[in-house]
Structure formats: C-alpha cells, structure tokens
C-alpha cells in the first residue's frame, strides 16, 4: 500500500513530477472527498476607469501585483498590463496604452498606493517592480512580500519559478500544464482572451501563496532571515541593476580587431601542424585530427556518442605530447574572449540608458552566492593579458567617478 500523504510532498520537494503521476495516480485509488472543486476567478478591466481600481486598492490592506512587459525592457518601456488582486480569486487590471507618456500618466495615478508604508505588496519578483517604478519617479515603500525570495529562504536547493511554487503549495499547475495532471482548476471569464486569463491566473496564484509561505517562514523560524537579510538585499541589488554599467564600445571594437588577427594567425599555425584544414571548433573533426591522424594518444577512447572527447580537461593533460595542443587551447581562449565578451557585450547595452543592466540573482545558489546574468559580469577574465584588456573596457558612467 502507498501512503499518498507521505510520498506526495517528498516527490514534489525533489521535483519528481513524473513519479507523482505514474506512481501516485496509477497505483492507488484517489480520495475523491479531498478533491478541490473548480473555482471561479473574476477578472475586471479597469482600463477606462482607473479610479474605481484605485479606490479598491486604497481600501485594501494588502494586494498582489503582477506586471506584464511585452515590448522593450524595464529601462526603455512601460508595462502593458498592471494586474492587481485584493481578494481571493478576484483580479483587476489596467491595460496601459502604447503611448509612453499616456502610460506614465496612468502609472502615476497609483503612486500613493505604491508609496503607502501601511500596505502589503505581494509580488512574484519585486526587484523588477522596484526598478520600473523608480524610472517612473515612484519609490516603492509598501511592506513587501516577495514569493521568489520567501521560497528561496525555505527551499534554497530547488527552483523558485512561480509555476513550481504553485504546484508545491497550492497543488495547482499554471496554464500550459497537461490537463490530466491538474488538481485544481480555475475558471475564467469566457469573453476574456487566453492571454488575459493567463495574467489573471498568475495574479491570483501570487495572492494565494502569500499566506502559505508566510506561515511556513514562521513555523520554520526563518522569518528573521527573510526580513532582516534577504529582503533588504533586494533593494540594494535593484539599485545596482538600475544604475547599470558603462562600457567603452570603441575600446571593445579595437580589442575585437586584435583578437581576430591573433585567431587568424593561430588558426593557420594549427592547420600547418595538422597538415590539413578542418573546423577547429568541431569536437568531432578535432578529435579525428588529434587521435586518428596525429596519433597523439593511442589509449584515448571514444565516448558513448562515438567521438573523442576534446574537452579542456583532456587537452591540458596532453600539452606536452604535441605542440598543436597549446595552439588549440590558445585558439579556444581567444575565441571565447571574442564571442563572449568583445563582440557580445555591446549587444547588452540598453537603448534607453546606454548602459548594461545585468540581472543579479540572489535566489540561485543554495550557498547564498549571487549570480549575474545577461550578461554575466562576475566572470570577466583577468588571468591573461587579453582578459585584462576586456576589463579596461568597463568605464565610469560619469567623469566625476573613478574605478578603484
């Protein structure tokens, strides 16, 4: 006999979702008395009457916020939708106009709500909200509850995606999941589009998760860690992202030209040592040249995929076996500098600010270490002369500041 109440939370915590269906749904009979009935979610458009939504928010002590960006970035556009929920299964939204000035006018009508210290704001990822509101001249002063950060504090080793958290705490799968796996169904207004229903669904789920995650933080004794360490850090990281980083594109262009020249020279040297031209970036072709033609390591075996491994770890061990090895390692290093940094970094410059705004993720590593994405600014190389040149391309955004 399988005890569902014991296995179900274990499977979900370990993200063994296929086993939830295969084992729990097939090997046991469901207790239909505990099945959740369908729930109706109201979704009201206040685009033509923001005042009525404002009144609803003014009367509420807490509200969930879900913001939709379709075009542009946090730094050069405004949201297309602002979705709010002040009650369970009741969602209201504003569809903002495409005209940026008109959109900003509507956003500013909510300034008093966002700056009210007595209100609780529930968000799936409040750092983004802090940033776009700051652009609008609004300082978010609500008492914040961040779903992602709360779940990270409770479960640092697993995903904090909203859909993942909804499944774990509400036994609910967001739209896009297979119907047969769905434990709870939310019914929406048939006149609303599928996209609007998706926004309503997420907003309602955010509202529902607040109480459950709060209870968990209190019961586990982690509320102080959440309030005193993690949430203050959210605001610091938001300020860092908002400030951005400036780069000297002319310097990077010059570095790119130098790297290309060196890559071309090394490429020709590799061809001479191999006595043929081939795609150096192809592991298959490189493996055949090194181990079949040049016979560098007669004991080197092929992998299960049927080709030789040419990873850096493998090549470093063979450095003394043939001069072509060091050339290949140099080629790869320069190629990475060129494609990952010298050529790629300018593409991350936001057209609205002229700066790079990386994303700092504090809910990624269980150890608490921050990660940096789009682009990763934490692994700019410094070991080689070429890598240090890349770092020189990072400059201050103002002549009154210096890098130390």
What are these regions (language model features)?
Residues 1-97, 121, 157, 185-195, ...:
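Conserved "right-hand" nucleotidyltransferase catalytic core of DNA-directed polymerases
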Residues 49-50, 103-107, 126, 386:
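Amphipathic coiled-coil/heptad-repeat helices and related helical stalk/stem segments
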Residues 71, 99-101, 130:
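Short acidic, S/G/P-rich loop/turn micro-motifs used as interaction or catalytic elements
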Residues 78, 85-90, 105-216:
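Charged catalytic and DNA/RNA-contacting regions of genome-maintenance
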Residues 110-111, 391-393:
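A generic local secondary-structure boundary/capping motif
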Residues 404:
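An acidic, glycine-/histidine-flanked metal-binding catalytic module
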């Amino acid at each position: 006999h399988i005890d569902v109440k014991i296995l179900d939370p274990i499977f979900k915590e370990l993200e063994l979702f296929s086993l939830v269906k295969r084992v729990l749904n097939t090997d046991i009979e469901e207790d239909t008395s505990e099945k959740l009935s369908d729930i109706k979610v109201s979704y009201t458009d206040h685009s033509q009457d923001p005042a009525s939504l404002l009144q609803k928010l003014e009367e509420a002590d807490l509200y969930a916020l879900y913001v939709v960006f379709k075009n542009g970035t946090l730094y050069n556009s405004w949201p297309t939708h602002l979705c709010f929920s002040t009650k369970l299964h009741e969602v209201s939204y504003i569809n903002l106009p495409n005209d940026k000035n008109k959109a900003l006018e509507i956003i500013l009508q909510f300034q008093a709500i966002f700056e009210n210290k007595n209100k609780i704001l529930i968000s799936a990822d409040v750092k983004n909200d802090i940033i776009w509101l700051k652009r609008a001249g609004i300082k978010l002063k609500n008492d914040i509850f961040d779903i992602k950060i709360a779940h990270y504090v409770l479960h640092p080793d697993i995903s904090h995606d909203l859909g993942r958290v909804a499944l774990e705490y509400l036994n609910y799968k967001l739209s896009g999941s297979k119907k047969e796996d769905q434990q709870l169904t939310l019914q929406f207004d048939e006149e609303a589009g599928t996209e609007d229903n998706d926004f309503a669904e997420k907003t309602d789920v955010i509202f529902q998760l607040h109480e459950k995650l709060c209870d968990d933080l209190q019961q586990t004794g982690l509320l102080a860690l959440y309030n005193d360490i993690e949430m203050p850090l959210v605001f610091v990281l938001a300020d860092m992202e908002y400030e951005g980083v400036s780069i000297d594109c002319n310097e990077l262009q010059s570095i790119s030209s130098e790297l290309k020249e060196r890559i071309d020279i090394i490429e020709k040297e590799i061809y001479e040592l191999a006595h043929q031209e081939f795609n150096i970036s192809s592991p298959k072709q490189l493996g055949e040249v090194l181990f079949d033609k040049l016979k560098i390591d007669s004991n080197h075996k092929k992998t299960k995929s049927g080709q030789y491994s040419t990873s850096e770890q493998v090549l470093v061990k063979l450095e003394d076996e043939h001069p072509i090895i060091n050339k290949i390692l140099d080629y790869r290093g320069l190629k990475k500098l060129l494609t990952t940094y010298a050529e790629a970094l300018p593409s991350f410059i936001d057209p609205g600010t002229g700066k790079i705004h990386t994303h700092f993720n504090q809910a990624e590593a269980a150890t608490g270490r921050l990660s940096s994405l789009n682009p990763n600014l934490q692994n700019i190389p410094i070991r080689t002369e070429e890598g240090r040149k890349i770092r020189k391309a990072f400059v201050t955004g103002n002549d009154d500041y210096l890098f130390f």
